[in-house]
Amino acid sequence: MGFHHVALAAADMEATHIFYTEAMGFELVKAVVAPTPDGGWAKHLFYDTGGSKGLIAFWELHDDALPPVRGGISTAVGFPEWVNHLAFDPIDAEHYEMCKKRWLDLGADVVEIDHGFCTSIYAVDPDGTLVEWCLDTRTLDEQDRAHAASALFDPAPALEDPPVPDFHLADPSVTPPWKR
């Protein structure tokens, strides 16, 4: 069973829309505009991620009873951006490379990491949420499951070597469209 959608509040819906349509290639497919419980109103905007079933949605909130949106899903609660993040599944290796090129062409710096079982590229959305394209490079097997089960409740598990990031810097003369 998958998920239907993940919903996040956006501080700047225009910048968020530009990022998720132009940089991610997602399509806006549904909007629900309704009152909020405390007398304001909100737009709930749904984007098709282009993969299997599963949407991402953003709230544009117009309600003085609610606090302003502050930071990404990780930094807003005091964690570094790498802790809470969004990871999307590219169609294949060609799509993964196309996503990396698109981010760089649009002016976004990209971090790439080979995790051993998957390879990932990372960029940051307008609210400061880390966004990832994660390409599986091998099938998880019984050895992976056994390791996960033993690590789950081990108070002092053996540490693995940290992955080495590869930094792809965008042309500094290009301003990402969601930052204009």
Question: Which stretches of residues belong to each language-model region?
Answer:
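A broadly used, surface-exposed interaction patch
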Residues: 58, 65-70
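A compositional/structural signature marking long, glycine- and acidic/polar-rich segments
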Residues: 63-64, 78
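Histidine- and/or cysteine-centered catalytic micro-motif in compact active-site loops
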Residues: 61-63, 91
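Core segments of cupin and vicinal oxygen chelate
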Residues: 9-60
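Short, acidic Gly/Pro/Ser/Thr-rich loop/turn segments
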Residues: 54, 65-66, 138-140
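Short Gly/Pro-enriched turn/cap motifs at secondary-structure boundaries
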Residues: 35, 77, 111-112
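Vicinal oxygen chelate
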Residues: 3-11, 46-50, 69-180
